[in-house]
Swiss-Prot record:
This is Cytochrome b6. PANTHER family: CYTOCHROME B (PTHR19271:SF16). GO terms for molecular function: electron transporter, transferring electrons within cytochrome b6/f complex of photosystem II activity; metal ion binding; oxidoreductase activity. Its cofactor is heme b; heme c.
């Protein structure tokens, strides 16, 4: 093992990277509340893993969505467990994200020079809420259908561009297959990609600037 490790270390400087990570200074005022961001990250990774597993059995059509969810819960091996973890971890992710935002705000972590870190965090918070809205509709039951109809109808009150936004969200004049396809694409591809990109930037900035000091 030492030979293999040394081979990679000579080329990639693994030990230098490890030393940099483990030697990073942690301010003495840091407490458990500073772990909320890491817990949110953990929830996101669990969501990615369980969501990926669910895509093997979920069918994003208005005629088969609900029946495929029932099949996952009743017929698929450990399907009930994976979907339950996905569902409850989604709620946990939202809760941890909200608490993390409050912690950062109350401790002044958004101030100079960490404004960009705050902005990326707000964008990820918006993505998290969007995850909830789009995921809620995927079973395409009565609750999901009417939730989509209400949510996509809200922008209609915006002057001039409101109807165009509704058309863009629904993919049609009414809620249907095009809407479900859009929400499925957003939930499984667009939002995870955006979240991952901004999360990378978020952590790189934290790594560069360090944890903010006490008030």
């Amino acid at each position: 093992m030492a030979v293999i490790y040394n081979w990679f270390n000579d080329r990639l400087e693994i030990q230098a990277v490890a030393d940099d990570i483990t030697a990073k200074y942690v301010p003495p005022h840091v407490n458990l509340f500073y772990c909320l961001g890491g817990i949110t990250l953990t929830c996101f990774l669990i969501q990615v893993a369980t969501g990926f597993a669910l895509t093997f059995y979920y069918r994003p059509t208005v005629g088969e969505a609900l029946s495929s969810v029932r099949s996952i819960m009743l017929d698929t091996n450990f399907g009930w467990l994976i979907r339950s973890v996905h569902r409850w971890c989604a709620s946990m992710m939202v809760l941890m994200m909200v608490l993390h935002v409050f912690r950062v705000y109350l401790t002044g972590g958004f101030k100079n020079p960490r404004e960009s870190t705050w902005v990326t965090g707000v964008i990820m918070a918006s993505c998290t809420v969007s995850f909830g809205v789009t995921g809620y509709s995927l079973p395409w039951d009565q609750v999901g259908y009417w939730a989509v109809k209400i949510v996509t109808g809200v922008p209609e009150a915006i002057p001039v561009i409101g109807p165009a936004i509704v058309q863009l969200l629904r993919g049609n004049s009414s809620v249907g297959q095009a809407t479900l396809t859009r929400f499925y694409s957003l939930h499984t591809f667009v939002l995870p990609l955006l979240t991952a990109v901004f999360m990378l930037g978020h952590f790189l900035m934290i790594r560069k600037q360090g944890i903010s000091g006490p008030l």
